[in-house]
């Protein structure tokens, strides 16, 4: 995924109301940009961090700038725009970067499924194999004690719990079911379920894996010009 036009940078003052952030532009002026991330953003929104933002050509938008990447004091790059995770996953599948998901004939997004009024992020299908249901989750939480250790989720997620129940049902019904962790933090080298944050999610994930749900974990190469989801890394839910 290339950023066109190129991203601009600013310094973060504060994030607030979940969807907004005040920044200082390179010109010295201050302003407000949109933040497409409703999560906790732990470690991703420290005042003084460098913010890389895109600019929409939609003149009707109240906040035309969108926060895409955080560059931390430690030099880590973090894609905080949660919309990008699904886009990156689709690109990675279509480009053949995720070998475990190759060989399918058709790719659909946001397809209704399950019994809890859900929409699957990605549905793969082919004439010679069962359908493959893929739920994509963005991983940006880096542990502050163990180097390289990432966690998901970064807050209690009832929505994520629902998705695990839906995936479990798909696996039990004979379909292929995938939980794809898209690691969007340059400092994360391995991922684990955040038992200390959402014990219920960790429990449901173990049940899902026993039922046949596969967990894939891919890390993105991140720069202020391009992001590619193309490197498999380890996942643990012990």
UniProtKB/Swiss-Prot annotation:
GO terms for molecular function: DNA binding. CDD domains: SfsA-like_bacterial. InterPro entries: SfsA, SfsA_C, SfsA_N. Belongs to the SfsA family. HAMAP family: SfsA. PANTHER family: SUGAR FERMENTATION STIMULATION PROTEIN A. This is Sugar fermentation stimulation protein homolog.
């Amino acid at each position: 995924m290339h950023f066109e036009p190129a991203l601009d940078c600013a310094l973060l003052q504060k994030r607030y109301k979940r969807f907004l952030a005040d920044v200082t532009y390179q010109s010295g002026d201050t302003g407000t940009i949109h933040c497409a991330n409703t999560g906790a953003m732990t470690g991703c929104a420290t005042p003084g961090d460098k913010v890389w933002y895109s600019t929409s050509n939609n003149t009707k938008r109240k906040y035309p700038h969108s926060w895409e990447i955080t560059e931390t004091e430690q030099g880590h790059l973090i894609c905080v725009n949660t919309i990008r995770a699904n886009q990156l996953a689709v690109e990675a599948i279509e480009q053949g970067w995720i070998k475990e998901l190759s060989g399918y004939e058709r790719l659909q997004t946001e397809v209704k499924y399950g019994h809890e009024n859900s929409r699957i992020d990605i549905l793969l299908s082919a004439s010679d194999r069962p359908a493959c249901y893929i739920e994509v989750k963005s991983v940006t939480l880096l542990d502050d004690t163990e180097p390289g250790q990432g966690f998901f989720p970064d807050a209690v997620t009832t929505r994520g719990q629902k998705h695990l129940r839906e995936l479990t049902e798909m696996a039990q019904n004979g379909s292929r079911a995938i939980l794809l962790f898209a690691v969007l933090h340059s400092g994360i080298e391995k991922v684990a379920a955040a038992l200390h944050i959402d014990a219920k999610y960790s429990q449901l994930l173990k049940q899902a894996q026993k039922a046949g749900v596969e967990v894939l974990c891919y890390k993105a190469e991140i720069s202020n010009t391009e992001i590619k989801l193309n490197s498999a890394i380890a996942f643990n839910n012990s």
